[in-house]
Amino acid sequence: MYLFYVLLSSLFLSALIYVIGKSHPNLFMFISLFVNVVTILYLVFKDYGQYIIAKPINT
């Protein structure tokens, strides 16, 4: 169910980014770079992700 939600939201974001890219190429470059960075961070910290979501870090 969680995986389905992630897939659906990524498809929605892809469509949104495509529409923005058509009208604002510079913004499109920034967003695509941001998405790539977030994806890499997610893949690196995948093991910690569920722990952080379940138990927010208290400072």
Curated annotation (Swiss-Prot):
One GO CC term, this protein: host cell membrane
Subcellular location per the Swiss-Prot or TrEMBL entry: Host membrane
Membrane protein topology class: Single-pass type I membrane protein
Side Cytoplasmic, residues: 46-59
Membrane topology (Extracellular): 22-24
Signal peptide extent: 1-21
Entry keywords, A to Z: Host membrane, Membrane, Signal, Transmembrane, Transmembrane helix
TM regions (residue ranges): 25-45
ATP-binding keyword on record: no
Name the UniProt record assigns to this protein: Uncharacterized protein ORF59
